[in-house]
Amino acid sequence: MTTPVRTRFAPSPTGFIHLGNIRSALYPWAFARKSKGVFVLRIEDTDVERSTEQSVDAILEGMQWLGLDYDEGPFYQMQRMDRYREVLKHMQEQGLVYPCYMSTEELDALRERQRASGEKPRYDGTWRPEPGKVLPTPPAGVQPVLRFRNPLTGVVAWDDAVKGRVEISNEELDDLVIARPDGTPTYNFCVVVDDLDMKITHVIRGDDHVNNTPRQINILRALGGEPPVYAHLPTVLNEQGEKMSKRHGAMSVMGYRDAGYLPEAVLNYLARLGWSHGDAEIFSREQLIEWFDLEHLGKSPAQYDHNKLNWLNNHYIKEADNARLADLSKPFFAALGIDEPTLAKGADLVSVIALMKDRASTVKEVVDNAAMFYREPNPDADALAQHVTDAVRPALADLAAALKACEWTKEGIAAALKATLGAHKLKMPQLAMPVRVLVAGTTHTPSIDSVLMLFGRDVVVSRIEKAVV
């Protein structure tokens, strides 16, 4: 019987969560769903000084927005301290750890001497018990750290799903501190206990954790466990080629929602930011689950491309249900001072969204372009002077009369425009541009008949008549 796949996302709630961070949730989530396995959420909050409830909320909110549902958790490391102490006690009883009284100052001085002589700076095992070795006398009043007895010989090796075979000599590794002087366990120890207890089979995480992996494998084996499959993801770079970070201008995950991106577009883009399925650029959440595998994870850093994300978001906006987009648009209208009562009194919002969405990269852009339907026109003086000329006023007057009488449909409005053009021997731009300026306050709109139909007969006629009276 095969072991069920169990993956995890284990963020530290110490601030900002950007696309590079949340990708480390997407891939294990997709792999668990593909494998009909279990996806676990674990909050690694042992850094008490930097961990905040606000950061936890940002992680949960970002995952929920993208639809990354978890099966177990969230588990909080700070709530598992009794379990860590229990394992530490077992390790002490088994001789797997030992107390070390070397002070920070002594350790710094040791490393300086090692650097000066061309050695790799590392703890030298001063307090490590060995047969026949006489240990220094513990200093009075000093609480020791606990160090793990790392094997002195041999090799730690694993077949990384991204990096291939990785081998590290144990001689390269010193004895890791796994408990601080106050007894609190350290990160690398907690991770191992959690992965063992939660029966994690696949660890899919950023390659900044590669250096931790041999140490974690040795602790895992000392506790009688077998290492999971590791897949260390290359870094996500920003558009300037730097590692994505808040310091280098990365946007938070929820910042994309607030800028008008759809979650399905961000999910699709994020999936392609380090994984591929042939030449497929656009795929649904269901297709991602069907296709996802570890074999096609990229081996090189992935670079964020904002234009590509905009292209994808435009695709999903065009495909999206108009009523859903109308609901999503309301906060963006509110930011422009257009409240819901104003929207209700103006042109039908769902119809406006349907007309305006195709050219927009974000919901915010849809709203910016659609705001004209809910505001009084405020055309630029140059546009008025250029397009609303004395020569065209007679045609505008006739058009207003024709629009009063025509059937108020796209076809009826188009017929009124065509008749006016014919009577005054004008070309469409000569009439359509002044009408756009007078009715919408701008020269940039979709087809004039569609726009006028949504504004409504009374608004259109009154705005044209004001200019020709």
Swiss-Prot record:
* Record field: compositional bias (Basic and acidic residues): 116-131
Question: Where does it sit, as one GO cellular component term?
Answer: cytosol
Q: What class of enzyme is it?
A: ligase
Q: Does the keyword Cell inner membrane apply?
A: no
One GO BP annotation is: glutamyl-tRNA aminoacylation
Stated EC number for the protein is 6.1.1.17
Q: Does the keyword Zinc apply?
A: no
Enumerate the subcellular locations listed in this protein's record, separating them with semicolons.
Answer: Cytoplasm
Q: Where is this motif: 'HIGH' region?
A: 11-21
Q: Where is this region: Disordered?
A: 116-139
Cross-referenced SUPFAM superfamilies, in alphabetical order? An anticodon-binding domain of class I aminoacyl-tRNA synthetases, Nucleotidylyl transferase
Q: Which InterPro entries match?
A: aa-tRNA-synth_I_cd-bd, aa-tRNA-synth_I_codon-bd_sub2, aa-tRNA-synth_I_CS, aa_tRNA-synth_I_cd-bd_sf, Glu-tRNA-ligase_bac/mito, Glu-tRNA-synth_I_codon-bd_sub1, Glu/Gln-tRNA-synth, Glu/Gln-tRNA-synth_Ib_cat-dom
What this protein catalyses is:
tRNA(Glu) + L-glutamate + ATP = L-glutamyl-tRNA(Glu) + AMP + diphosphate
- What protein family is recorded? Belongs to the class-I aminoacyl-tRNA synthetase family. Glutamate--tRNA ligase type 1 subfamily.
Q: How does it assemble?
A: Monomer.
Protein name, per record? Glutamate--tRNA ligase
Please report the organism this UniProt entry assigns to the protein: Paraburkholderia phymatum (strain DSM 17167 / CIP 108236 / LMG 21445 / STM815)
